[in-house]
C-alpha cells in the first residue's frame, strides 16, 4: 500500500482527530489519554496552516490518515527560535519507515521556516521512538524521573533536542 506524506490541509482535520484519539487511547505515547475535542483539533490545524507551522500527515490507500508529525514554534519571544515536535502513527502502520519520512519532511520544513532548535519529550520505555529520533540527529538532554503516571504506573520522560 502506497503511503503519501503531505502538508496537512483542512480536509485532513477529521482524520487527524481520529488518529490522535486512537494513539492517545493506547496510553503509551502521548501526553493525553484521549483525543482533544473536534473544535480544539480544528483550531490547532487551522492555526498551523495559517501561520505556516510545519505539520505533515501520512495518507494510505484511499486517503486514510495514518500518521502525523508537527513542529509547533514556541510563542514566547526568547524561545521563538525553537519548536516542539509531536508525532504519532496508527499501530498497524508502525515499523514501515513512515515515521522517518514524516519527521524528515517536518524537519525540512522547520529549516525552511528558519527554526533553529526542535525539542521533544518521549517516555523512556518508547525505545522505537527514541531510536527514530536518534537516527535523525536528536540528542538526549536530560530525564525527568517518574514524570508520567498512567494507571498507577510511573514512567521516566526523556528530553531530546536537535539543532538545525
Kindly give the residue locations of the regions a language model identified.
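Conserved catalytic-core motifs of GNAT/GCN5-like acyltransferases
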Residues: 117-123, 134, 139-155
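Acetyl-CoA-dependent GNAT
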Residues: 7-10, 24, 28-92, 103-105, ...
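Glycine-rich acetyl-CoA-binding "A-motif" of GNAT/NAT acetyltransferases
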Residues: 63-67, 128, 154
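Terminal substrate-recognition subdomain of acyl/acetyltransferases
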Residues: 155-164
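Conserved GNAT acetyl-CoA-binding A-motif
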Residues: 103, 110-121
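A short beta-loop-alpha structural element at the N-terminal edge
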Residues: 4-16
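Conserved G/P- and acidic residue-centered "switch" motifs that form tight phosphate/ATP-binding loops
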Residues: 97
